[in-house]
């Protein structure tokens, strides 16, 4: 049986100057601009027919603070599709509290790289289906990696970064996703710092490299500018494609995106299904 390909909107949430949660968009994990209210945007995407919804607290890890659980709870009250929440999750207590706030899945990046056993413990305590490992990867054109791919005629590898892309780790992203799979991750959420916010398309070489390395479902993220970019991600092996700007700024609707993909032959759930 052919598995349905998923279309997933995402909101990046930070605290505004008054300390209130707000949605922001940026380019290459920088140049953040106010976009809207997280609860209102969640409600909008739920009603629009999204397959899932992702809420990322984009500064919790870097600032060493807890995830905005009150806001997560308010968002969970408005969405009746699977909700993934990431940002600031460092241990199993954080996972538990995030799930209690209404998340169906948690996305972990920095916390899992700092302590890889968190993947094992999270999967054992809550089930692999709850544990999404997020990878914020960037291209490196040097000889310090382990797995190389060709990009525009040059050989590069993909480095894992932490704390919202602010710090490199020296860790090869392909090595890490394979380890995360072995430890029990139920899904992999692959972000490209190079493509983020550009709307020039996903980093297809990155997506393909991850999909070729693992059997765990992969969500492609960063760089979507049109439904055709999602098709490219699916062709590279992704099970789901995540987008932000094209939906936030009404460049494409969820319904229009799904119709375009379905017409192109991809197995897509209808918005009103």
Swiss-Prot record:
Catalytic residues in the record: 12, 136
Pfam family, one: His_biosynth
Cellular-component GO terms for this entry: cytoplasm
UniProt key word Cell membrane: no
UniProt keyword list: Amino-acid biosynthesis, Cytoplasm, Histidine biosynthesis, Lyase
Stored SUPFAM superfamilies: Ribulose-phoshate binding barrel (SSF51366)
Pathway(s) it belongs to: Amino-acid biosynthesis; L-histidine biosynthesis; L-histidine from 5-phospho-alpha-D-ribose 1-diphosphate: step 5/9
Domain of life: Archaea
Enzyme class: lyase
EC code(s) of this entry: 4.3.2.10
Primary location group: cytoplasm
Residue ranges of the TM segments: none
GO molecular function: imidazoleglycerol-phosphate synthase activity; lyase activity
Disulphide-bonded residues: none
HAMAP family for the chain: HisF
Primary role: IGPS catalyzes the conversion of PRFAR and glutamine to IGP, AICAR and glutamate. The HisF subunit catalyzes the cyclization activity that produces IGP and AICAR from PRFAR using the ammonia provided by the HisH subunit.
Family indicated by similarity: Belongs to the HisA/HisF family.
Protein name from the UniProt record: Imidazole glycerol phosphate synthase subunit HisF
Species whose genome carries this gene: Halobacterium salinarum (strain ATCC 700922 / JCM 11081 / NRC-1) (Halobacterium halobium)
């Amino acid at each position: 049986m052919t598995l349905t390909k998923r279309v997933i909107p995402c909101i990046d949430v930070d605290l505004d100057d008054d300390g209130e949660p707000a949605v922001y968009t940026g380019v290459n994990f920088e140049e953040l601009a106010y976009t809207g209210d997280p609860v209102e945007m969640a409600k909008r995407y739920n009603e629009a027919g999204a397959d899932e919804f992702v809420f990322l607290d984009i500064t919790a890890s870097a600032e060493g603070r807890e995830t905005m659980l009150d806001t997560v709870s308010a968002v969970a009250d408005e969405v009746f599709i699977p909700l993934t929440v990431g940002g600031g999750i460092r241990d199993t207590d954080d996972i538990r509290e995030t799930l209690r706030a209404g998340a169906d899945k948690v996305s972990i990046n920095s916390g899992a790289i700092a302590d890889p056993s968190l993947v094992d413990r999270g999967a054992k305590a809550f089930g692999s289906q709850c544990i999404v490992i997020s990878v914020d990867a960037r291209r490196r054109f040097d000889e310090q990696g382990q797995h190389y791919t060709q990009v525009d005629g040059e050989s590069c590898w993909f480095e894992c970064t932490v704390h919202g892309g602010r710090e490199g780790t020296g860790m090869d992203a392909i090595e890490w996703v394979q380890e995360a799979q072995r430890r029990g991750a139920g899904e992999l959420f692959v972000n490209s710092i190079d493509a983020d916010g550009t709307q020039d398309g996903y980093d297809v070489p990155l997506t393909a490299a991850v999909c070729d390395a693992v059997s765990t479902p992969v969500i492609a993220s960063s760089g979507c500018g049109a439904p055709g970019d999602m098709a490219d991600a699916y062709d590279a092996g992704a099970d789901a494609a995540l987008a932000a700007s094209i939906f936030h700024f009404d460049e494409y609707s969820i319904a229009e995106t799904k119709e375009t993909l379905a017409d192109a032959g991809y197995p897509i759930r209808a918005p009103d299904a």
